[in-house]
Amino acid sequence: YFAQHAGEWDTIRSMQVAEEEVERAILGLMKNRRPGHLLDVGTGTGRMAAVLGAGASRITALDRSPEMLRIARTRLAGSPVPVELMQGDFAALPLGANSVDSIVMHQVLHYASAPDLVIAEAARVLRGGGHLLIVDFAPHDREELRRDAAHARLGFSDGQMRGWFAASGIILESTEALSGGALTVKLWLGRRR
């Protein structure tokens, strides 16, 4: 899907706040938290791994698409920390239990038909005390994103996230909303018990 529809990203991006503002908010939330071994789920071009990776001890960048992993490989080639690129699915992460310190899912969860299971799978690989950061959309009614951009979900509420986090043993520590267009970007940061 992503290789065939790359041109549509500009349309989606125009519906939300500038990505630079999202990145500033992400860095602000993670400012006092050491990423350790960082897992970037749905790495795409590797941008989030690059943004958060400077403070990491190691980066695992995971994506289903071999084409996206090739792009990420180029972007992350000069990383100051070891990077492993891995093909895999967010519903069945190819990592052992308690194996990573931080996980970021940036604009990924809305592709999940069962987001609760994706969060539970993230919790499985996250070490106790580790952080899960999900960046996605608040609830919206842009049905064309289902049709044109393969979104399985039209955003998430704080209540949904709080429930899914709690069911997976993750304490929701912080939420942030960034408005600036038809879509509101939300950041949910949790810590595994």
Per-region residue spans from a language model:
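Conserved catalytic loop of SAM-dependent methyltransferase domains
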Residues: Q4, R13, V17-E19, E23, ...
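Conserved alpha-helix/loop element of class I SAM-dependent methyltransferases that forms part
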Residues: Q16-H37
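N-terminal, positively charged/glycine-rich alpha-helical extensions of SAM-dependent methyltransferases
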Residues: Y1-G7
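Class I SAM-dependent methyltransferase SAM/SAH-binding core
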Residues: H37-A92
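A short acidic, Gly/Pro-enriched loop at the edge of an enzyme's catalytic core
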Residues: A91-I103
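A short glycine-rich, Lys/Arg-flanked "PGG" loop and its adjoining helix->strand segment in the class I
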Residues: D116-H131
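A short SAM/SAH-binding and catalytic strip from SAM-dependent methyltransferases
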Residues: D101-A114
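C-terminal alpha-helical "lid/dimerization" subdomain adjacent to the S-adenosyl-L-methionine
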Residues: H131-W188
